[in-house]
Structures are given as structure tokens and as C-alpha cells.
Amino acid sequence: VLTAEDKKLIQQTWGKLGGAEEEIGAEALWRMFHAYPPTKTYFPHFDLSQGSDQIRGHGKKVVAALGNAIKNLDNLSQALSELSNLHAYNLRVDPVNFKFLSQCLQVTLATRLGKEYSPEVHSAVDKFMSAVAAVLAEKYR
């Protein structure tokens, strides 16, 4: 459960991305494809090279969805409902992949934010991403 302090830290951290959302999303995806190669199977039509237009485009979508979730921290299920349906029923993405993306996004944030990615921020972002993964996996039951 996200505390009021967690929510504040998440919103502040997201605000520090300053227009680099597309790059952050693309880097997180690229990291995921390399750290967890089986995730590539969901993107057979993508150019998976670093910085490709497809990775950048999908990274932008991922970060936009997370931004929407951050605006709706008190109602993640509603904010992510369409995305949950898409991944469960149409794309049939194995829910473990949401955790992989979470880990890679956190590494990306840590490398970009440096000391600003404090243990407290890390904890809040980890809780948030776990909550997002849980909501995205809800429709699988």
C-alpha cells in the first residue's frame, strides 16, 4: 500500500524527468530486452536495436501510461483498466514481464537521477511499480 509520503515521492520523482520520458521508456525497454531476452518474443516486428524508432515509440507509451497511473494513484485499477485488458486478452503477455520491466525502469531511473534516487525514492517507486504490475495482472485470474 502506498503511503502519503510514497505518493509524494513518486510524484516529485516523476516531475524530475523533465521531458526525458521517451528516452527513459526506451532505455528501460532496451535494458529489459537485454537482461531478459525472452521478452523480445512479444515484439517480433520491432527493430530492437538501441534507440530504434519502435523502441522509442513504445517506451513513450509505457511512460505515458505510468504518468497516467501517477495522476490516479488512488485508483490504479481504473486508470490501468484498458491496458490490463489489452495485455491480458489481446496480447497475452505473461505477467512476470511486468516485474522485469519494473526492475529495468528502476535501474534506468537510478542511473539518470543519481543521488536523487534515494533509498526512500527507490522504495516508493518499487511499491508503485509492484502495484502497477498487480493491477495489470488482475485480469489474468
Swiss-Prot record:
The keyword Nucleotide-binding does not apply. One of its GO terms (biological process) is hydrogen peroxide catabolic process. It comes from the Eukaryota. Residues 1-141 form the Globin domain. Keywords: Heme, Iron, Metal-binding, Oxygen transport, Transport. Heme b binds at residues 58, 87. It holds the Pfam family Globin. InterPro entries: Globin (IPR000971), Globin-like_sf (IPR009050), Globin/Proto (IPR012292), Hemoglobin_a-typ (IPR002338), Hemoglobin_oxygen_transport (IPR050056), Hemoglobin_pi (IPR002339). One of its GO terms (cellular component) is blood microparticle. Red blood cells. One of its GO terms (molecular function) is heme binding. The keyword Transport applies. Heterotetramer of two alpha-D chains and two beta chains. PANTHER family: HEMOGLOBIN FAMILY MEMBER (PTHR11442), HEMOGLOBIN SUBUNIT ZETA (PTHR11442:SF41). Involved in oxygen transport from the lung to the various peripheral tissues. Belongs to the globin family. This is Hemoglobin subunit alpha-D. The lineage of its organism: Eukaryota, Metazoa, Chordata, Craniata, Vertebrata.
